[in-house]
Amino acid sequence: MFDSTLNPLWQRYILAVQEEVKPALGCTEPISLALAAAVAAAELEGPVERVEAWVSPNLMKNGLGVTVPGTGMVGLPIAAALGALGGNANAGLEVLKDATAQAIADAKALLAAGKVSVKIQEPCDEILFSRAKVWNGEKWACVTIVGGHTNIVHIETHNGVVFTQQACVTEGEQESPLTVLSRTTLAEILKFVNEVPFAAIRFILDSAKLNCALSQEGLSGNWGLHIGATLEKQCARGLLAKDLSSSIVIRTSAASDARMGGATLPAMSNSGSGNQGITATMPVVVVAEHFGADDERLARALMLSHLSAIYIHNQLPRLSALCAATTAAMGAAAGMAWLVDGRYETISMAISSMIGDVSGMICDGASNSCAMKVSTSASAAWKAVLMALDDTAVTGNEGIVAHDVEQSIANLCALASHSMQQTDRQIIEIMASKAR
């Protein structure tokens, strides 16, 4: 798989990126449930007549208000129904890519007939949990996903257990590539980006290809809140300058508009999130184009952005009350700073300023308004880079920012992992009361 001469640590970095940066069609929380339903349907004897599903509170939060691609409908029930009737059980986060018009119509009919239910799993200690049970008469099949959007841990039918994931790693098995990130630093990541052979990371250019196509769709269609298209119109009207700063925000938010509005184009995700992938990709692409960067330079900047975003997010719960577009934008800040300046000091200063700026942004579920937060995060990232280029940054004398960027990241992630859990519960309670 790798050149045998490649640094083993670098191999783990590349594996981590390949594991966390993947194409995804539709918001990944509803898609996780759709995948569970699709796999269950593949195990069922006969056509699906009824769907029952249970999800964690966090997954419910991120599925209440998001449009499922191709359906024009929001919410988890349509995702579960379409996954069961038209999903590709082998396609992972692109489970709905082959859904036909007939499958969509059948899913809507199943929903209208009251044959689909989605409830919160109680009790539930897992942050990311989805279980789908499909029925044909008295026959049934059930699939459970835990911990990761595609991490199937249990498959069972009326005939018995088909599959159960082993909880422990046996001797001889390799640890997850993500484990290495808990033992690395941004400085080591930068060394990797500067020195790794281009051929080993060329694949990351696919993130630019997919997310640029999504951005163009967002600008040409009436998706979501159409923030990108609206800002572009304001440039034409003379109310907003058409410059590098506005281009970063417009093209990044346009991709999120299309993503959250239900466009049937995949995003290249990061850490299980399309919006995080968009945020880690598009600002870097825009700046690279501005400076006329070639493919190799773009690939190195994208690798720094995506790997830095993964590195930070690996210290967070998979889902939390912290809007992770902000942490993905910290990766983007690193990638943009590298393109302009290349120095570790500039990169670390930009990330520190980001932590001092947007770290309080909450995640109140996946919806069209995510594009607002994506645009805010992208704008903050470029502002932080501009400050760092002038040797200015939020310092360790201010707020949760420390004198060392690694400690600043740890402080932010500690907030999200511990004290913001109560915030998360309050957000879920508010959203649940609206849905009643």
From Swiss-Prot:
InterPro entries, per database record: Ser_deHydtase-like_asu, UPF0597
GO molecular function terms listed in the Swiss-Prot or TrEMBL record: L-cysteine desulfhydrase activity
Domain of life: Bacteria
Single biological process term from Gene Ontology: L-cysteine catabolic process to pyruvate
Similarity comment: family membership: Belongs to the UPF0597 family.
Cross-referenced PANTHER family: UPF0597 PROTEIN YHAM
HAMAP family linked to this entry: UPF0597
Protein's name according to its UniProt entry: UPF0597 protein YhaM
Source organism of the structure: Escherichia coli O6:H1 (strain CFT073 / ATCC 700928 / UPEC)
